[in-house]
Amino acid sequence: MTPNRRSTDSYNMLGASFDFDPDFSLLSNKTHKNKNPKPPVKLLPYRHGSNTTSSDSDSYIFNSGSGSSDAETPAPVAPIFISLEDVLLNGQLIDFAIDPSGVKFLEANYPLDSEDQIRKAVFEKFTESTTLFVGLCHSRNGNFIVQKLVELATPAEQRELLRQMIDGGLLAMCKDKFACRVVQLALQKFDHSNVFQLIQELSTFDLAAMCTDQISIHVIQRVVKQLPVDMWTFFVHFLSSGDSLMAVCQDKYGCRLVQQVIDRLAENPKLPCFKFRIQLLHSLMTCIVRNCYRLSSNEFANYVIQYVIKSSGIMEMYRDTIIDKCLLRNLLSMSQDKYASHVIEGAFLFAPPALLHEMMEEIFSGYVKDVESNRDALDILLFHQYGNYVVQQMISICTAALIGKEERELPPAILLLYSGWYEKMKQRVLQHASRLERFSSGKKIIDSVMRHGVPTAAAVNAQAAPSLMELTAQFDAMFPSFLAR
């Protein structure tokens, strides 16, 4: 009898007779046609004389269930221990592999010694047919024993497993929620040459489709996180194309992947490979800057732009480029967009002083007033459903600077700028207070400019221009040797 035969047959293992139904479930409570069905025999882990499941149990017993509500209790059956060799000799390896309890038994008892004959026989059985191997990879339970094979495989066994994956349809495995685990583990455990061959095969697939699939994207993420950058340069080149970048960034899964690629390319500038990585990063960021306006207005792609703006280190130069080349001169229109307004908020928060000054001045005086309504940009944003959040961010930035909550200490001259911006917004808010009070957002804006503890412009101006006595004291502190003469 072939070991993977799908039929209702009676098996005998070490004196215990039990049935297998067509779904291969060792725990099946199959209903028999006869009136007095024989209770099915179940495979249970045996530990310290009890039938409790344990991850470290390596002994299994056959035990019969009650199966009947009769008052008469059947005589207890003595436990019968089995081994991996017993399963192999009785041709039930596949049945165990696709059963939830059986596969745990196989995992627990798979030999660690690569020269073990039982291990070799088990490996050969699972890889004798590509159809069988792929079926196990796609199986809810079978994928666990395949992962065990991958984890402990020798280089020769790795090559065989790799051949099976490629011949059996690697792309389909990547898109399957169970088989993709096998591919991910192979990327992590295989040696360099076999991983390189696996990557070469992945590079031939439709990468845009993989990056926007909620299952196969995990394979690409594993590549980006685990492998050296020089093994997936093809993926950076793929993203550096405008159409490819837009397709991936506009997807709710793909946008996060692009952020991970940026993070990996920009990490640890002290490593020798950073020069190579910075070239790839520049290629990708050039494409992102070129498409910044479209990305900022997309539901998911805007997160990529926000991520760049909020990043530090080497990414600050790209943050400044995005603000200068993409956001400036477009602040009013982007602030009124549902998604781009988040980008503008982040830009105000993380912009360096020079660019922040340009952004503030653009909102205050960079646009011609509307002829019909006589409203300027600040008036428009105050009452806009998205733009009001940008104004709130502007007020918050000025308030934080004036009350000393900035991380860095600002010189008096810079504080004067913040004070001037704050006073302009405060006066405009108070001018429109009666209308703003009708909206919850307007009430928040009014509250933000009426906060106590924010110094007035006069106070800041006085701080910026120290008195003669203060200048003398500062001089004395700087040059104490002069006084000692």
Curated annotation (Swiss-Prot):
Pfam families: PUF
Start and end residues of each stretch annotated as RNA-binding: 439-454
InterPro entries: ARM-like (IPR011989), ARM-type_fold (IPR016024), PUM-HD (IPR033133), Pumilio_RNA-bd_rpt (IPR001313)
Single GO term (MF): RNA binding
GO cellular component terms, A-Z: cytoplasm; nucleus
Region (Disordered): 29-72
Amino acid composition bias (Polar residues), ranges on this chain: 49-71
Pumilio repeats: 86-124, 128-163, 164-200, 201-236, 237-279, 287-324, 326-361, 370-411
Keyword vocabulary terms for this entry: Cell cycle, Cell division, Developmental protein, Differentiation, Oogenesis, Repeat, RNA-binding, Translation regulation
An individual GO BP term: post-transcriptional regulation of gene expression
Effect of a null allele: Simultaneous knockdown of puf-6 and puf-7 results in ectopic primordial germ cells (PGCs) outside the somatic gonads, premature PGC proliferation in L1 larvae and germ cell death. Does not affect germline development in adult hermaphrodites. Disruption with puf-5 and puf-6 results in abnormally small oocytes, disorganization of oocyte nuclei and cells, inefficient yolk uptake by oocytes, embryonic arrest with impaired eggshell formation and cytokinesis defects, impaired repression of glp-1 in late oogenesis, and mislocalization of rme-2 to the cytoplasm instead of the plasma membrane.
Further information: Puf-6 and puf-7 are >98% identical on both nucleotide and protein sequence level. Experimental approaches often do not distinguish between the two genes, which are collectively referred to as puf6/7 and are considered to be functionally redundant.
Function, in words: RNA-binding protein that binds to the consensus sequence 5'-CUCUGUAUCUUGU-3' in mRNA 3'-UTRs and modulates mRNA expression and stability. Functions redundantly with puf-5 and puf-6 in oocyte formation and organization, early embryonic cell divisions, and repression of expression of glp-1 and other maternal mRNAs in late oogenesis.
Protein name per its UniProtKB record: Pumilio domain-containing protein 7
